[in-house]
Amino acid sequence: MRQRILQLRKRIKEEKPLIHCITNPISIHDCANVILAVGARPIMAEHPAEVADITASAGALMLNLGNITDARIKSMKRSMRTAMENKIPVLLDLVGVACSDLRLDLARELLSIGHPAVLKGNMSELLAVSGLPSHAIGIDAGAQDALTAENMETVSEVLRAFSRSNQAIVLATGKQDFVTDGERVVLVQNGSAALSGITGTGCMVGALTAAFLPGCEDTITKEMTDSIETGVWSGVEMGSNGRSGNYLAAAVLGTALMGIAGEEAEKISRGPGSFQVNLLDEIYGLSDRQLLDLLKIEMY
């Protein structure tokens, strides 16, 4: 995994893929900047009349349900259809689905159109979309839904099943981030309390992960082909061009990079204003050696 994420990071810097984001106005500026910071190119088009054209030319699509509007609902549906038709990987960020029936219904409609590469949310949001009881406080996860040592086995079973049923990587954010492809589980334990002191850091994790999705395309191996032919999904999506996307590494890299950058930025920041600036600098400037040395993950 460690070598894989370094290769992925390098590939994005070299290829500079276009990442189409339909996101909320609260974090749109920050999402665009973190995509630029890792070497990809953001485009934030959201008018319903143009989004299909934009998505068709992109390397990945990010849909963020925060601060939703009628126009963005229409645009997200159109872009989701276009992405599915063109085998473009999608990250769906389930912001607020645990506190809003409008967003929950939209999330389910988008999932009925096709399978995203990554489904991202906090534990309350993922439980809500799974049809299970959740205890969100606004867009924040409720304490009762938090991942703990005591409920790890139960939560792991729920999220792995949700991953398999949606044929998507599931990324559950929290004090430790839980990433699964339905079989493998990676716990990312990097992070800083300062990240919750500014707006948009969760959205930025989604943007970072989306930026790395185009770099996950690899030539199909025999193992991947056998997995697809036998109906066993393990984070691999077959595209019409004979390529695959193994998206687990993108989700791990997106969350780890934000967590490590947060840790490093906190050390040199006086408060939330300087932290926000330093966070972007750390995402941009973190070396591969630092990334490997500071990475805290558990795999099982």
Label each residue range with its predicted role.
Residues 1-44:
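Glycine-rich phosphate/adenosyl-contacting loop at the front of the ribokinase-like
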Residues 23-28, 193-206:
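Glycine/serine-rich anion-binding loops at beta->alpha junctions
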Residues 34-86:
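Active-site cofactor/substrate anionic-group-binding motifs, chiefly glycine-
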Residues 42, 87-91, 170:
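Hydrophobic beta-strand scaffold residues
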Residues 72-121:
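Glycine/small-residue-rich loop that forms an oxyanion/phosphate-binding "nest" at active or ligand-binding sites
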Residues 102-185, 191-194, 227, 232:
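Conserved phosphate/ATP/ADP-binding segment of small-molecule kinases
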Residues 128, 199-242, 251-256:
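Short, small-residue alpha-helix embedded
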Residues 223-236, 259-300:
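Charged C-terminal helix
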